[in-house]
């Protein structure tokens, strides 16, 4: 059928089926209107609208913020910026010396109280969690930041992933989040006030080949946050899963910032200024998820709008294969120098 015949058939359908034509016009208009509305909503949330004021969760009212993985990268920035906002800060991490120095810096800069607790989440047993729970038991926790996390040493196929590495990733990314949240949640429920931030990853929203265990644990955080958020909504507690692309940190192994890869301070500022707003995660079908940093938000919304997850998975697979090749070559060069 040539182009002329197709056009002639289309015109005849419009002429002979006015109701069908009207229906198609209405449906097309609704579809276009919905995309315009959703896009404007995402832009407003990401660039203009303010999030929930932190005073709702006890800032400058004597409440504490608990931060895991609090001495480096994103966790350190959460500790500093929550202190600046008026929270006392309870820092949880493995290295006692870094805990002490970070706590001293916070007290000197912001004049708030601090407390520290050393725990290795990769090896934590029931006794270790009971000890942490006991330390947190009398604390008026307004904010919990489940930030501690671990990824693979380098991208690798699941069949080649060391068992110890798999176990550590699950212990740190999943078990630590469950246990610490379970320790502070009863107090939040009793006080009818609280904010729980679970630091996630795009690897949980879009499966990441060669980081299968890490990707699976981050997907867990997405579902856990949605379920818990619905449970405690009646108690005036906000649960937010932070969908995060790359940030300059030891975990990401990225040292240079860019428009798509912010430094920790810029990333945390975006999170704390957009509490309660899904931003780029709007219309993603992931309740209680927020993608607040502007470039991450646009990327997340773009994936939702265009629906190219399968292409993104393939791209990520290729990227991780290249990263692994370069990492192995570097290991070979280093071995020759020894």
Curated annotation (Swiss-Prot):
It is found in: Endoplasmic reticulum membrane. One of its GO terms (biological process) is fatty acid elongation. The active site is at residues 214, 218. Its main location: endoplasmic reticulum. GO terms for molecular function: ketoreductase activity; very-long-chain 3-oxoacyl-CoA reductase activity. GO terms for cellular component: endoplasmic reticulum membrane. The chain crosses the membrane at residues 20-40. Pfam families: adh_short. Keywords: Endoplasmic reticulum, Fatty acid biosynthesis, Fatty acid metabolism, Lipid biosynthesis, Lipid metabolism, Membrane, NADP, Oxidoreductase, Transmembrane, Transmembrane helix. It comes from the Eukaryota. NADP(+) binds at residues 66, 95, 120, 147, 214, 218, 247, 249. It catalyses: a very-long-chain (3R)-3-hydroxyacyl-CoA + NADP(+) = a very-long-chain 3-oxoacyl-CoA + NADPH + H(+). Its EC number is 1.1.1.330. Pathway: Lipid metabolism; fatty acid biosynthesis. PROSITE patterns: ADH_SHORT. It is a single-pass membrane protein. HAMAP family: 3_ketoreductase. Component of the microsomal membrane bound fatty acid elongation system, which produces the 26-carbon very long-chain fatty acids (VLCFA) from palmitate. Catalyzes the reduction of the 3-ketoacyl-CoA intermediate that is formed in each cycle of fatty acid elongation. VLCFAs serve as precursors for ceramide and sphingolipids. Belongs to the short-chain dehydrogenases/reductases (SDR) family. This is Very-long-chain 3-oxoacyl-CoA reductase. It comes from Laccaria bicolor (strain S238N-H82 / ATCC MYA-4686). The lineage of its organism: Eukaryota, Fungi, Dikarya, Basidiomycota, Agaricomycotina.
């Amino acid at each position: 059928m040539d182009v002329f015949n197709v056009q002639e058939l289309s015109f005849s359908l419009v002429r002979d089926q006015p109701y069908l034509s009207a229906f198609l016009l209405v449906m097309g208009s609704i579809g276009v209107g919905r995309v315009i509305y959703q896009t404007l909503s995402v832009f407003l949330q990401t660039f203009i609208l303010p999030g929930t004021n932190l005073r709702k969760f006890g800032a400058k009212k004597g409440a504490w913020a608990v931060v895991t993985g609090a001495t480096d990268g994103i966790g350190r920035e959460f500790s500093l910026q929550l202190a600046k906002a008026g929270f006392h800060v309870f820092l949880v991490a493995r290295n006692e010396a870094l805990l002490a120095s970070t706590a001293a810096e916070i007290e000197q800069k912001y004049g708030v109280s601090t407390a520290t607790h050393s725990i290795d989440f990769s090896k934590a047993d029931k006794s270790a969690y009971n000890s942490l729970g006991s330390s947190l038991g009398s604390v008026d926790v307004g904010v919990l930041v489940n930030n501690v996390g671990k990824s693979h040493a380098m991208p690798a196929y699941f069949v080649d992933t060391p068992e110890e590495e798999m176990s550590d990733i699950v212990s740190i990314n999943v078990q630590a989040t469950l246990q610490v949240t379970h320790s502070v949640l009863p107090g939040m429920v009793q006080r009818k006030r609280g904010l729980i931030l679970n630091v996630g990853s795009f690897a949980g929203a879009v499966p990441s080949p060669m980081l299968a265990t890490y990707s699976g644990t981050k997907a867990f955080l997405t579902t856990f946050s949605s379920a818990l958020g619905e449970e405690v909504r009646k108690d005036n507690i906000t649960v937010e899963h932070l969908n995060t692309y790359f940030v300059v940190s030891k975990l990401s192994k990225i040292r240079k910032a860019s428009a798509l890869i912010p430094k920790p301070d810029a990333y945390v500022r975006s999170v704390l200024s957009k509490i309660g707003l899904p931003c780029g995660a709007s219309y993603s079908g992931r309740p209680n998820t927020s993608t607040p940093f502007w470039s991450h938000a646009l990327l997340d919304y773009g994936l939702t709008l265009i629906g190219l997850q399968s292409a993104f998975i393939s791209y990520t697979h290729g990227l991780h294969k290249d990263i692994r090749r370069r990492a192995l070559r570097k290991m070979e060069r280093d071995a020759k120098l020894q």
